[in-house]
Amino acid sequence: MSNKNIIHLESINASDSIAFQKNYLMNEKPVIIKGMGKDWPAVRRWSATFFKNTYGHIKVPVCYYKTKQQERYRDQVKIPLKEYICLAEKNNHIDSDVELPYLGGWIYYEEFPELLDDIDMMLPCFPDNWLYKLPPSISIPPTNLIIGYKNVSSPLHTDSFFVNSVLTMIVGEKKARMVSPSHTFAVSNGQDLFNPEIAKQVLKQGADIFEGTISEGDAFYIPPGWWHNVINCGFTIAVQNLHVDTYRFPLSEQQIRGLVLPILTKIENLGREAREELFKAEKALPPPLSHQIGCFIEHEKNYITRLKDSAKRSEDFLSSYYLNNSSS
């Protein structure tokens, strides 16, 4: 497959934040941001040796994307960071048919907040981050650390919760291939867009494939909903920062609700069963004392009111903003 079938990703200088917001962030268009992290202390300090010597004893979660694609973060196998980096350095220059572990997203900042001093969490190209406004019980980690090597990669996927994702290279180089959400019909989760046959089939279905290289000190902006497949060109260290702005948060909220509502529905169904049994029992027995002194009826009325208010706010938003803007 010749390069003419692949669309080269655009790039922009990190200092031109206004142009980035206008042309890329607001239009949800991917771009390589040149020099985003070039002045970060991490670029000067972080290395394989730094992490082996400073955090080598820490057990970190590793993933196996081919065999355990949907594995939750808390269920991932943990190995000492020094052991992982030694394995990465050993396997960086050889081909291997055996699936190797990948440190594809270590949520490091809670355990080692000092590492945040080496990066910039308040990216100048982005407005206020709504992830910081979420309650702790449903927080979405705003940053994670990725250490990779030549024989491991993340397969084709989209990021959850409609986040803006910014992948900043600290050490090494990565290549990325992307497909727009408008061409979702041509791809599926877990594919390898760097496989010539798969890429050929995607292009044959009428989809566009975008490709770019992210070098040390540069960042890769991945808009919400975009399919992306990232490979390591050698040993790499990168930071992924997640961001949700005002425009995207209603979509994030919708996905979060999608996780919470099934749990709430199960609880409500159990409550409904209990009420049915209670109604039957009331024919022979009076209501339990706890129902009388625990404000049961008042709480139920308040719950119904909250549900109605929430539904009305959603209806008002659809009619006054979304539907009007869709028809214009």
Where are these regions (language model features)?
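N-terminal accessory scaffold of Fe(II)-dependent oxygenases
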Residues: 1-219, 227-328
